[in-house]
Amino acid sequence: MDSNTVSSFQVDCFLWHVRKQIVDQELGDAPFLDRLRRDQKSLRGRGSTLGLDIETATHVGKQIVEKILKEESDEALTMTMASTPASRYITDMTTEELSRDWFMLMPKQKVEGPLCIRIDQAIMDKNIMLKANFSVIFDRLETLILLRAFTEEGAIVGEISPLPSFPGHTIEDVKNAIGVLIGGLEWNDNTVRVSKTLQRFAWGSSNEDGGPPLTPKQKRKMARTTRSKVRRDKMAD
């Protein structure tokens, strides 16, 4: 096992512990709490994959951080902070929409790279809006926290979320997953729109009809998903 992978996990565990203390003292805002919950799931998945105990890793991570801070000067810290671009947290969804539990009548789940796509195949003939919470850097989507598909009545009918055991994803991963989700929803004659905020930071532009400007590759992926479903339906008949 790569030593850098282990030390990175150990430091992440300790930093999560520090952030948890901030929340316990009621010093964190909603986005801070949201990231804390998501990172907790990610750390559990990574710990299981690496075969490492989180509590032990947290103690080792503390030692690593303390050693770095002991050697770090205030001047070097200031220079590092000044030269590092800051991420922004974008919220399409309210805290209630983000944390709400939802259930599927006809569940369908698909893993697309490091992302998990869930869709309720029982939903038909609905107007659906895709909304997401994510971080942005250099005016481009950096990390997807959670994407959900809402009907006009406010019901959740689809979702894209990062896999806890597979940390890290690119903007292309997110766009490909959105293409698969849209293809699945449109198959049942639903009309799908993407929020202007998500269009802006994922594609750098927006369409008046709310449709994302998918690339030819993403359109082919949607077409393959549709053809595969047609074949399965014919076999079932």
From Swiss-Prot:
Spans annotated as RNA-binding and homodimerization: 1-73
Principal localisation: host cell
Intervals of motif Nuclear export signal: 137-146
Motif Nuclear localization signal in this chain: 34-38
Region (CPSF4-binding): 180-215
Location in or out of the cell: Host nucleus; Host cytoplasm
Renumbered residue ranges of the record's region Disordered: 204-237
Post-translation changes: Upon interferon induction, ISGylated via host HERC5; this results in the impairment of NS1 interaction with RNA targets due to its inability to form homodimers and to interact with host EIF2AK2/PKR.
Pfam families from the UniProt entry: Flu_NS1
GO annotation, cellular component aspect: host cell cytoplasm; host cell nucleus
GO terms, molecular function: protein serine/threonine kinase inhibitor activity; RNA binding
GO biological process, one term: symbiont-mediated suppression of host gene expression
SUPFAM superfamilies for this protein: Ns1 effector domain-like, S15/NS1 RNA-binding domain
Biased composition (Basic residues): 217-237
PABPN1-binding: annotated segments: 223-230
Keyword terms, alphabetized: Eukaryotic host gene expression shutoff by virus, Host cytoplasm, Host gene expression shutoff by virus, Host mRNA suppression by virus, Host nucleus, Host-virus interaction, Inhibition of host innate immune response by virus, Inhibition of host interferon signaling pathway by virus, Inhibition of host PKR by virus, Inhibition of host pre-mRNA processing by virus, Inhibition of host RIG-I by virus, Inhibition of host RLR pathway by virus, Interferon antiviral system evasion, RNA-binding, Ubl conjugation, Viral immunoevasion
Record's subunit section: Homodimer. Interacts with host TRIM25 (via coiled coil); this interaction specifically inhibits TRIM25 multimerization and TRIM25-mediated RIGI CARD ubiquitination. Interacts with human EIF2AK2/PKR, CPSF4, IVNS1ABP and PABPN1.
Function text: Inhibits post-transcriptional processing of cellular pre-mRNA, by binding and inhibiting two cellular proteins that are required for the 3'-end processing of cellular pre-mRNAs: the 30 kDa cleavage and polyadenylation specificity factor/CPSF4 and the poly(A)-binding protein 2/PABPN1. In turn, unprocessed 3' end pre-mRNAs accumulate in the host nucleus and are no longer exported to the cytoplasm. Cellular protein synthesis is thereby shut off very early after virus infection.
Domain comment in the entry: The dsRNA-binding region is required for suppression of RNA silencing.
Recorded family membership: Belongs to the influenza A viruses NS1 family.
Protein name: Non-structural protein 1
Organism placement in taxonomy: Viruses, Riboviria, Orthornavirae, Negarnaviricota, Polyploviricotina
Gene: NS
